[in-house]
A protein has these predicted regions:
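Re-entrant/interfacial helical elements at transmembrane boundaries that shape
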Residues: 168-169, 235-237, 261, 265-266
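Interfacial loop-to-transmembrane junctions
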Residues: 237-260
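Final/C-terminal transmembrane alpha-helix of multipass membrane proteins
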Residues: 256-272
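Juxtamembrane boundary at the C-terminal end of a transmembrane helix
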Residues: 269-283
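Short helical (or helix-break) motifs at transmembrane helix termini and adjacent helical loops
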Residues: 158-168, 224-236
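Hydrophobic side chains within alpha-helical segments
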Residues: 19, 56, 163, 231-234, ...
Length: 283
């Protein structure tokens, strides 16, 4: 056994857990105590903060260009939002997002090769605009928007939690060592299993068919790993360890919620295609 004190071995984990509990409490307040419009505003603010963090991948030493990227991101969200008011428009947006994440898989497989500012900016817009719109539309689901959004968040975040603990306990085979050395296939499998459990429980509570929701959730959770790896890849391109320092033990907005950038749009696409969401969304 190691002679290191228990407090030393688990201090990092304790900090992560405490931060996560605070975030969960804040999420509950945002979803169930605030009106939908306030939730939408906070979603946009959070995405723009994430955009500021992403801008460090674009032009780390040029504040004016970083601010320009955030402004471009805001314009992208503003342009995409009215498009998402119709089923066909939302489907088009989410399909484009899905194609982007498929392309991202091949980019990640190439490993941490440097990219220019323009490509980094395009990747940021493609990653952040769809998740902002999808989160907003899920919250506006008539009757149970807060619960639907909570379900989607928990499914994707469960993949993170399951991967963290399964990877630490059983991790042996590296997933993408040149991009994120700490991630393992065992962790991914553990994350998918935890997402599946959350999806089954959530589907039953929402009155949705488990046979439809479970595979959608697992597929979205699998792609959430791509969102995580994409942020890791961009950090390696930029020589950064964390995207920010907003959350103790978790880094910045992107470090905490990078998996949502891929997982939420693809889960929303599946739920929309299955007819489980999207009826009665306001324009």
């Amino acid at each position: 056994m190691s002679g290191a004190p228990v407090s030393g071995r688990y201090s990092g984990l304790r900090q992560r857990v405490l931060t996560a509990l605070v975030l969960i409490a804040a999420l509950a307040v945002v979803l169930f105590a605030l009106p939908p419009a306030a939730t939408l505003a906070l979603v946009v603010v959070a995405i723009l903060v994430g955009g500021w963090e992403w801008s460090a991948f674009v032009a780390p030493t040029r504040p004016a260009l970083r601010a320009a990227f955030v402004a471009l991101l805001a314009l992208g969200i503003a342009a995409a939002w009215p498009l998402s008011g119709s089923r066909s428009g939302m489907l088009a947006l989410l399909v484009v997002a899905g194609l982007w994440w498929l392309l991202a898989v091949f980019w990640i497989l190439r490993g941490p090769q440097r990219v220019g500012a323009v490509l980094a900016a395009v990747a940021g817009i493609a990653s952040l605009v769809p998740v902002a719109v999808a989160l907003g539309r899920l919250r506006l689901e008539p009757g149970q928007g807060a619960w639907v959004l909570l379900f989607a968040l928990l499914v994707i975040m469960a993949a993170d939690v399951g991967a963290y603990f399964a990877g630490h306990r059983f991790g042996r085979i590296k997933l993408a060592p040149s991009v994120s050395p700490g991630k393992t296939w065992e962790g991914v499998i553990g994350g998918l299993l935890f997402s599946l459990i959350i999806a089954i429980v959530g589907a039953r509570l929402l009155g949705w068919p488990v046979a439809v929701v479970a595979p959608l959730a697992v597929g979205a959770a699998a792609f959430s790993v791509v969102g995580d790896l994409m942020e890791s890849l961009m950090k390696r391109h930029s020589g950064l360890k964390d995207s920010g320092h907003l959350f103790p033990g978790h880094g910045g907005i992107l470090d905490r919620f990078d998996s949502l950038t891929a997982g939420i749009p693809l889960l929303t696409l599946g739920l929309l295609q299955a007819g489980l969401v999207g009826e009665g969304w306001p324009p």
